[in-house]
């Protein structure tokens, strides 16, 4: 069943990418995108940012005003600051609650679309082989392991295929990451060497 074979492979790739980038990072990016949409939450976020700027501005004006020489002005600024701060804290708490609900929804959807879907497929297709091995190609003991837990003997089960995909994807991903890190480090080292040579030539010319 090629479609199931590819589906399991793609699911493992998606899960690896999510784990590599970090679920918290992805949640933060999705939240930033969400509050840019024309929704009530985006309006709330804009109002929260406006109130924050107002509180900071009033705080600066208070600090720049002497409470002794200009007490009336300072007291007025203090009242405005306290009122703005109270409004900001209320709006910020409301936005925090919205973000918590958003994060919970995103986590639920992400789990259902990745790990949850993987578990469902492994349960639903536990008796269906991913592909069949050539007869007599490997010992029956190995065939039993590859067909574990419920696939027919001489085939590869979805559980074994999923585990193999996860291992290969992790190895390839780690290898790509290590290669990119090595190339990046080599470029930085080359730039340092070039800069050092340029400084030496500059000193010689002087």
UniProtKB/Swiss-Prot annotation:
Main location class: endoplasmic reticulum
Coiled-coil intervals, chain numbering: 42-99
UniProt keywords, alphabetically: Coiled coil, Endoplasmic reticulum, Membrane, Transmembrane, Transmembrane helix, Transport
Pfam families, alphabetized: CHD5
Topology, Cytoplasmic side: 25-110, 173-206
Recorded superkingdom: Eukaryota
UniProt keyword annotation of Signal present: no
Compartment annotation: Endoplasmic reticulum membrane
TM annotation in the entry: 5-24, 111-131, 156-172
InterPro entries named in the record: Get1, Get1_fungi, Helix_hairpin_bin_sf
GO CC terms of this entry: endoplasmic reticulum membrane; GET complex
Residues in compartment: Lumenal: 1-4, 132-155
Membrane topology category: Multi-pass membrane protein
GO function terms (MF aspect): protein-membrane adaptor activity
BP GO terms, sorted: tail-anchored membrane protein insertion into ER membrane
Role noted for this protein: Required for the post-translational delivery of tail-anchored (TA) proteins to the endoplasmic reticulum. Acts as a membrane receptor for soluble GET3, which recognizes and selectively binds the transmembrane domain of TA proteins in the cytosol.
Oligomeric and partner information: Interacts with GET3.
Family membership noted in the UniProt record: Belongs to the WRB/GET1 family.
The protein's name: Protein GET1
Source species: Blastomyces gilchristii (strain SLH14081)
């Amino acid at each position: 069943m090629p479609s199931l074979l590819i589906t399991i492979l793609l699911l493992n790739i998606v899960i690896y990418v999510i784990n590599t980038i970090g679920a918290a990072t992805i949640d933060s990016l999705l939240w930033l995108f969400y509050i840019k949409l024309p929704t009530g939450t985006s309006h709330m976020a804009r109002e929260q940012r406006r109130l924050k700027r107002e509180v900071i501005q009033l705080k600066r004006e208070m600090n720049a005003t002497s409470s002794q020489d200009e007490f009336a002005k300072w007291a007025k600024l203090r009242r405005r600051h306290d009122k703005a701060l109270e409004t900001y804290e209320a709006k910020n708490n409301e936005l925090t609650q919205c973000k918590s609900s958003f994060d919970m929804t995103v986590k639920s959807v992400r789990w259902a679309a990745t790990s949850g879907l993987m578990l469902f497929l492994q349960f639903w297709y536990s008796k269906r082989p991913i592909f069949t091995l050539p007869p007599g190609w490997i010992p029956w003991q190995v065939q039993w392991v590859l067909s574990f837990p419920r696939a027919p003997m001489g085939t590869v089960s979805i559980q074994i295929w999923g585990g193999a995909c996860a291992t290969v994807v992790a190895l390839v991903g780690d290898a790509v990451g290590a290669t990119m890190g090595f190339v990046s480090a080599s470029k930085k080292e080359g730039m340092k060497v070039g800069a050092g040579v340029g400084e030496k030539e500059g000193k010689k010319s002087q």
